[in-house]
């Protein structure tokens, strides 16, 4: 009887481990505390270099904590979007450096970089991130000013007579 109980307990433990793995959908070999995943993200004139590693959810941008670098809460929420979609909100630490552009462009570059790094860390996230539109680069840039006009599209006032 005791051997049967031990076997059933082992089977139950194994089943619970397997069910947890299926819920997380992260392959076993990818949960590695040593490995780092690198990706670059771009938006407008901003370029972000992102390093992702298994951790406690700490995000550092240009040697500042995320809330210090982006004071607006909406920016922070959009940067956390890939983690919310993949349900890995406190499982990865992010270190990134951003150059160029303004605050909005830098936010988009970091978002794109984090999404690409998450895709590299666990390929099972690819479909989720692709469906959320986080892996595609937003190619919209400022239209150039044309000569003979006031702005890119604004013309001088036209007079018939």
From Swiss-Prot:
InterPro entries: Ribosomal_Su5_D2-typ_SF, Ribosomal_uS9, Ribosomal_uS9_bac/plastid, Ribosomal_uS9_CS, Ribsml_uS5_D2-typ_fold_subgr. It holds the Pfam family Ribosomal_S9. Keywords: Ribonucleoprotein, Ribosomal protein. HAMAP family: Ribosomal_uS9_B. This is Small ribosomal subunit protein uS9. Belongs to the universal ribosomal protein uS9 family. The keyword Iron does not apply. GO terms for molecular function: RNA binding; structural constituent of ribosome. GO terms for cellular component: cytosolic small ribosomal subunit. GO terms for biological process: translation.
């Amino acid at each position: 009887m005791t051997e049967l109980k031990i076997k059933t307990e082992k089977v139950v433990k194994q089943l619970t481990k397997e069910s947890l793995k299926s819920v997380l959908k992260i392959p076993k070999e990818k949960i590695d505390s040593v490995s780092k995943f690198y990706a670059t993200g771009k938006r407008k004139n901003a370029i972000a270099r992102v390093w992702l590693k298994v951790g406690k959810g700490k995000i550092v941008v240009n040697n500042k904590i995320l809330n210090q670098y982006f004071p607006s809460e909406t920016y922070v929420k959009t940067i956390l979007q890939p983690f919310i979609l993949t349900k890995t909100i406190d499982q990865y630490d992010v270190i990134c450096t951003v150059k160029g552009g303004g605050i909005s462009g830098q936010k988009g570059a970091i978002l794109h970089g984090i999404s690409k790094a998450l895709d590299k860390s666990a390929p099972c996230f690819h479909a989720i991130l692709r469906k959320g539109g986080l892996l595609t680069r937003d190619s919209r840039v400022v239209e150039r000013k044309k000569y003979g006009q006031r702005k890119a599209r604004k013309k001088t006032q036209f007079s018939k007579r």
